[in-house]
C-alpha cells in the first residue's frame, strides 16, 4: 500500500506537466481511501518540477528491483 512520503513510479505520460512514464515522485497527500494521490516530482537538488494529482491506476510503489535513470531537464530560471 502506498503511504504518505513514499516514492512512486508514474505509469503514464503527462506531457503537459513535463512528466514521462517511469518518472519517480513523492506522495505528499492521499485522497479518498487511496483512490488518488498528490505527488511531487523534483530534481536531485530538490527543485520542484511538478506537483500533480494522480489516480491510483496512474502510479505504483517503487520496488527494490527498479532501476532509476537520469533525465536532464531545462528548467526556467
List the predicted regions and their residue ranges.
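Long, low-complexity intrinsically disordered regions
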Residues: 64-77
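Basic/aromatic-rich interaction segments and small domains that mediate binding to polyanionic partners
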Residues: 2-65
Amino acid at each position: 500500500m502506498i503511504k504518505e512520503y513514499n516514492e512512486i513510479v508514474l505509469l503514464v505520460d503527462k506531457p503537459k506537466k513535463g512528466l514521462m512514464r517511469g518518472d519517480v515522485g513523492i506522495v505528499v497527500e492521499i485522497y479518498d481511501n487511496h483512490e488518488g494521490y498528490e505527488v511531487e516530482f523534483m530534481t536531485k537538488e530538490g527543485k520542484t518540477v511538478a506537483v500533480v494529482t494522480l489516480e491510483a491506476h496512474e502510479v505504483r510503489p517503487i520496488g527494490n528491483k527498479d532501476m532509476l535513470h537520469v533525465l536532464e531537464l531545462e528548467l526556467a530560471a
